[in-house]
């Protein structure tokens, strides 16, 4: 698919191939996480197509920068979005059930509705390109609702998330030679990619539906958002040391 994009990279609607790639990436997460290792190669193809460098030294530095960006994207998907959606959904569930006294699964429903509404609003703002402030606020809210910046657990995840969101805000405001480094088209494409990645990743809902039927084989019994988090963390497989000590 990235080679298909390369053939049409100069066309106005070439970004649709990137959006399709992210949808396939979301689906591949449900098959095996090693599929995410395709992302560095995809980023390199994108860089070489968009930023050809005649100077070999500049090309080397650009390739290293592209690899660093690909690692950041890989970490954002693997350690941010994949566990982050479940983590933020769990926070909503605890808030609505333990604090507000609502029935079970109320927080999850509210979270899903707010997540969809935030993504739609952010995509609309980046498409219309009328207010930079609203664009950036909607973009940050979308990233936060997807749980991408919240690495770790407890209050440490919240603090790390605040720092990451502040850094993203600075990047969104950064200008080079009087022009924004992150244009509205980049934000719009990024939001569409995150939305399609979420749609592909939602195939994990089948796990919860299957577990609710109580089949004979039901490891970790992921019937709610908290046990689903344990299931996604592969806690059902236990741990085994890489080096066994002889006794």
Predicted features, each with a name:
Residues 246-247:
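Conserved small/polar residues in nucleotide/adenosyl-binding loops
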Residues 32, 74-77, 194-214:
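Transmembrane signal-anchor helices characteristic of membrane glycosylation enzymes that use polyprenol
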Residues 8-26, 55-72, 132-144:
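Short hydrophobic alpha-helices at membrane interfaces in multi-pass membrane enzymes
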Residues 24-31, 72, 150-154:
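Transmembrane helix irregularities
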Residues 34-46, 80, 84, 158-164:
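Transmembrane-embedded, aromatic-rich helix segments that form part
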Residues 76-109, 137-161, 209-231:
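Membrane-interfacial interhelical loops
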Residues 115-135, 155-193:
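Cytosolic-side transmembrane helix boundary signature
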Residues 1-17, 44-57, 120-134:
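Membrane-interface transmembrane helices that cradle and orient dolichyl/undecaprenyl
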